[in-house]
Every structure is written in C-alpha cells, then in structure tokens.
C-alpha cells in the first residue's frame, strides 16, 4: 500500500547457498497505469526446478514498489527465504514429525492414566470426606485436567493433518498410505471432541452433585469413559507405530534409490573421463 499511488511492483529472487555468486534476478514486473491505485496485488508461481535451485540451496524472495513521486526510491518488502530440500529429505522430515506425535501421544496416555487414578481416589472416599469442599475442588481440578488433555490431543490431530497436507506434495508417499494416516488423525480428533469431553463433563457434574448417590454415579461414568479413552489411545499408538514402520521402510528405500542414482552418475562421469 502506498498513499502516493503505486506506479509499479516487481518480484525478485536470489539463489543462495550454492557456492556461486549471488545475483538478484527480477522474476516479474507489474506496471500500474492509474495514479489513484493505492493497493496492488500480484501473483507469480515459483518452481525451484525451473530456477535451477538444487537441494540444500535457498531462494530469497522479495518484492519492491515505487510510487509516483519524482525521483522516488523503491521500497522493498521483507525477504522470504525458501529452503530447497530433496524429496528424500522432505519425506524424512514428515516421518520425524509423525514420530514426534507418537511420543507426545505416549505422554497423553500417561497423563490420562493419572486422571483415572484421581477418579478412582474420588470414588473411594467415604461420604463425609466426599462432602467436603476440598473434595469437590479436587473433582473439578480433575475435570480441568481431562479438558486440557482433550485440547492437547485435538491440537495434535490437527497438526498431524497439516503434516499430511505437506506429505501430499511428495511423490514418495502413496495415496493409500496418506489415506490411512488421515483416518488415524481423524480418530484422534474425534476422541478429543467426544469421549474426552464427555469424561470432563462427568467429573465436573460429580463436583457439583447435590447428593452422594448422584456423585457416585457421575464418578462411575467418568471412570468407565476414561478406561475407554485409554483403550482408544492404546489403539491409536498401535496404528501409528505400524504406520511409522511403513514410513521408515519407504524413506529408506527412497534414500537407497538416490544413492544408486548418485553411484550411476559418478560411474558415467568417470567413464567419460577415462
């Protein structure tokens, strides 16, 4: 945006980290005829392959604009740096991110077990102790812990889906593999929005129950729901473990193929020089 009217904009790029001289090149320019234009937008596709950007290099992109003032100097945007990675490195990055999700899911399982233990302790209280205000607060705190775990798991499911959207850009990953992963991430989100929320509500209701029998009923329901949650988390862990093994095999095979291509290229180069 320029209050003096935009005269033109340009998009430029610089290839870095290649061991050669860095030269900024203009990718595209847009001229603006009207002096009244205060805001201008431009779209230009970028292809690392067409730019000759090898794996490990960086493409630095920035825009510039000039207005209609006499002798106006161009104004530059901030530089956006795009790191170029090979499909093998990208596949390994996706695999590592999903492996991190499994590690965090194990922590969710541990904390869910703690919630179940707290629920069992609340159930085991004698009526006099259960009627105390401190016990009611404890039930509400446990409900809040359950709610927090639900939010964490839901966030992890969304993160996993974003990883899969990135994986769709990589030809290494087969459509069926991505579909199976998507189903697992969706199950994770459904668990966070369903039974985990349900358990939190049951615990909260137990904290505000007007009678001992109502409290016991809510706690019993919460216990059953929490046990079901743990079973589903364990099932998710098994699915993710199995799919990580498949991803490991896929990325390893891709790396071996790349090594073979490199060896073949070196062999051809040596043969030409002999």
Predicted regions and their residues:
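Extracytoplasmic/secretory ectodomains and luminal regions
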Residues: 1-274
């Amino acid at each position: 945006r320029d209050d003096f009217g935009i005269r033109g904009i340009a998009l430029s790029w610089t290839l870095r980290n290649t061991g050669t001289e860095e030269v900024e090149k203009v990718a595209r320019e847009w001229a603006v005829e009207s002096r009244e234009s205060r805001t201008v937008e431009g779209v230009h596709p970028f292809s690392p392959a067409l730019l000759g950007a090898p794996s490990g290099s960086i493409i630095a992109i920035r825009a510039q604009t000039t207005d209609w003032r006499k002798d106006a100097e161009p104004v530059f945007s901030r530089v956006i740096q795009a790191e170029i990675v090979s499909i093998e490195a990208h596949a390994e990055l996706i695999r590592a991110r999903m492996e991190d999700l499994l590690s965090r899911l194990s922590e969710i399982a541990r904390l869910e077990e703690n919630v179940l233990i707290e629920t069992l302790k609340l159930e085991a209280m004698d009526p006099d102790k259960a009627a105390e205000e401190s016990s009611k607060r404890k039930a509400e705190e446990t409900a809040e812990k359950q709610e927090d775990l639900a939010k964490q798991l839901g966030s992890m499911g969304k993160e996993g889906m974003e990883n899969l959207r990135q994986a769709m850009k990589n030809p290494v990953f087969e459509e069926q593999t991505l579909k199976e992963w998507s189903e697992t991430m969706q199950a994770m989100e459904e668990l966070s929005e369903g039974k985990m929320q349900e358990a939190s509500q049951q615990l909260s209701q137990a904290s505000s129950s007007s009678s001992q029998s109502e409290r016991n009923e809510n706690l019993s329901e919460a216990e059953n729901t929490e046990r079901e949650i743990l079973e589903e988390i364990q099932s998710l862990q098994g699915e993710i473990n199995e799919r990580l093994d498949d991803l490991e095999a896929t990325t390893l095979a891709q790396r071996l193929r790349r090594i073979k291509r490199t060896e073949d290229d070196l062999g051809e180069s040596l043969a030409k020089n002999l």
